[in-house]
C-alpha cells in the first residue's frame, strides 16, 4: 500500500497537514545526510582549466577521451564526472565555482544542467545535448568544446 504517511509521534497513519510538513522535512533531511557518506566530486585535468567538462552516467569514457585529446593538443580543460546526483557531493558548489566556463554534456535534453543551475546558483553553464539514441562521438565533443573555448 502506498501513499500513506505515518504520524511523526505515534507511527500510526496520519493525514494531518502539520504532520505531513514534518515528515516531508524529515525525509529530505535523511537524503541530505547521505552527502556525509558519499565521496567528494573529483576533477581530472588542469586545475586552472579554461573549461570544465561535466558529465554523469554513461558518458564518462567519451568525455574523458575528449578531455585527454584536448589537453594533449594544448587546451587547458578539466573534467568532472558525477557519480551521485541526489544529494550532490558536498564540494560541488566549491568545485564548479572555480571555473569561468562549464559545459554539461548530456545524452538528453539537459535535465542535469538544469538541476545544477537550481542546486548551485550563479553558475554560467553551457550545454552540449544530443538525443540520438547513440553514444557521443568523441570528435563531435572535441569540436564543440573547442568552439566554446574560442568564444
Regions found by a protein language model. Give the residues of each.
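Flexible, low-complexity linker and terminal segments
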Residues: 1-151
